[in-house]
């Protein structure tokens, strides 16, 4: 059956700021306390969405979350009106304010793990929300992510959206950023590659930075998503590269159809894994980048592998890259050699995503890949699909509500909270989502 990969990109939220919240993510740490530009961040993301939609790649949008997230501050013991809660936390524990104001939901590669209908036992598309247990600020995302996905994939005959796994370290799950699918045409059954960093009883794990994904979580997600057990491989990420800042697999590898583009040191027991994939995926092609050409450090600083590998109708592929790759002589030299070599990659497309990149999120972090048949695509909430009208409406919306400068101190401004709620109220109507945000359901207004 014919099917297409639709990229659902996260829209950057109004409180996008640099707080260095993500230990193990070196860009996040390096840019801590810099002044951010939420308006520019949102527009950079929108430009990528529109350019890819214009190039013929199906593209949709996932909206930001409510931030600052007052309900969690109340759980932490801060009381009074919303304004009083903000004032108290800013004075007594500003680090909590930064955490509950993070715009990290923009990186929707961590929102969920997807199983296309061709791979599932019941013939539905399955989406399991990620618990993002390893980082407090990200663990706050699951409930609203579930509401958003249910509002977008709202036909229960075609889509099953599963709640996140229990919030414990043993079941740490980071979503599609640690998941690849390999195979022929999108509508054919594919091989799902789940990548984990640690498992109980296995001493092979990183020592400097945390391994965020567990094998136990990956196995549970595969079960929830009803993936045919014959179409699953579990592989461990190389713990040494996690210790060099590769906090998700999508920082060191990207797949599309029959191609796996990865660093030579991406996986533990890599040659064994690639042999397994060759045996089980027709036409499998591994493009392994040697450490002698691109070091792990350079891969992390340029986000070479946090790229999007997209298929054209003629079978050729386009690699979508951040501008940092073009600015690094060694990486850009390698990429031009890659273009000239015998492989499906025939075009490099570069985007300026600096605002997101400075927090450690490149092109692949910003998108959730969902393979859909034509019938399934028609069942998706049409208001989220990118086109000229939506692009213009979202740009106008960003111009109206987003600030062009934000510091950590600004997060305590009650006006920012009010601006955010008004903006999301308008956006949820624009995208026909219903009342997906807690402040809407509580009838809390802007107070």
Swiss-Prot record:
Pathway: Amino-acid degradation; L-arginine degradation via AST pathway; L-glutamate and succinate from L-arginine: step 2/5
UniProt keyword list: Arginine metabolism, Hydrolase
GO biological process, one term: arginine catabolic process to succinate
EC number, UniProt record: 3.5.3.23
One Pfam family recorded for the sequence: AstB
Presence of the UniProt keyword Hydrolase in the record: yes
Active site: 174, 248, 365
N-terminal signal peptide: none
A molecular-function term among this protein's GO annotations: N-succinylarginine dihydrolase activity
Superkingdom as given in the UniProt entry: Bacteria
Enzyme class: hydrolase
PANTHER family (alphabetical): N-SUCCINYLARGININE DIHYDROLASE
Protein name, per record: N-succinylarginine dihydrolase
UniProt source species: Escherichia coli O8 (strain IAI1)
Gene that encodes it: astB
């Amino acid at each position: 059956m014919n099917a297409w990969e639709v990229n659902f990109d996260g829209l950057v939220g109004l409180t996008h700021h640099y707080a260095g919240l993500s230990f193990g993510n070196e860009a996040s740490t390096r840019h801590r306390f810099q002044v951010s530009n939420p308006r520019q961040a949102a527009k950079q993301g929108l430009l990528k969405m529109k350019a890819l939609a214009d190039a013929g790649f199906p593209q949709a949008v996932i909206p930001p979350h409510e931030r600052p997230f007052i309900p969690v501050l109340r759980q932490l013991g801060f009381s009074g009106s919303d304004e009083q809660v903000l004032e108290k936390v800013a004075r007594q524990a500003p680090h909590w304010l930064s955490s509950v104001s993070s715009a990290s939901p923009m990186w929707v590669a961590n929102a969920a793990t997807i199983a296309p209908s061709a791979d599932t036992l019941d013939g539905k598309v399955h989406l399991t929300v990620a618990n993002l247990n390893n980082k407090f600020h990200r663990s706050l995302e699951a409930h609203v992510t579930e509401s958003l996905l249910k509002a977008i994939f709202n036909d229960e005959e075609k889509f099953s959206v599963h709640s996140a796994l229990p919030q414990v370290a043993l079941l740490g799950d980071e979503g599609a950023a640690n998941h690849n699918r390999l195979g022929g045409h999108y509508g054919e059954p594919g091989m799902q590659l789940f990548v984990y960093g640690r498992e109980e009883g296995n001493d092979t794990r990183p020592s400097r930075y945390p391994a965020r994904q567990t094998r136990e979580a990956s196995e549970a997600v595969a079960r929830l998503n009803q993936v045919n057990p014959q179409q699953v491989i579990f592989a461990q990420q190389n713990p040494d590269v996690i210790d060099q800042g590769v906090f998700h697999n999508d920082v060191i590898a990207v797949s599309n159809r029959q191609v796996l583009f990865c660093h030579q040191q991406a996986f533990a027991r890599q040659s064994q894994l690639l042999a397994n994939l060759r045996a089980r995926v027709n036409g499998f092609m591994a493009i392994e980048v040697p450490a002698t050409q691109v070091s792990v450090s350079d891969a992390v600083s340029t986000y070479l592998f946090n790229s999007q590998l997209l298929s054209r109708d003629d079978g050729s592929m386009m690699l979508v890259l951040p501008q940092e790759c073009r600015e690094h002589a060694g990486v850009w030299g390698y990429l031009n050699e890659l273009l000239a070599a015998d492989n499906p990659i025939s075009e490099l497309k570069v985007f300026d995503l600096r605002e997101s990149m400075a927090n450690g999120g490149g092109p692949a972090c910003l998108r959730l890949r969902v393979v859909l048949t034509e019938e399934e695509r028609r069942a998706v909430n049409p208001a989220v699909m990118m086109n000229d009208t939506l692009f213009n409406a979202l740009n106008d919306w960003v111009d109206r509500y987003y600030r062009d400068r934000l510091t950590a101190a600004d997060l305590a401004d009650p006006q920012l909270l009010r601006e955010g709620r008004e903006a999301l109220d308008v956006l949820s109507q624009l995208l026909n989502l219903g009342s997906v945000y807690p402040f809407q359901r509580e009838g809390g207004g802007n107070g």
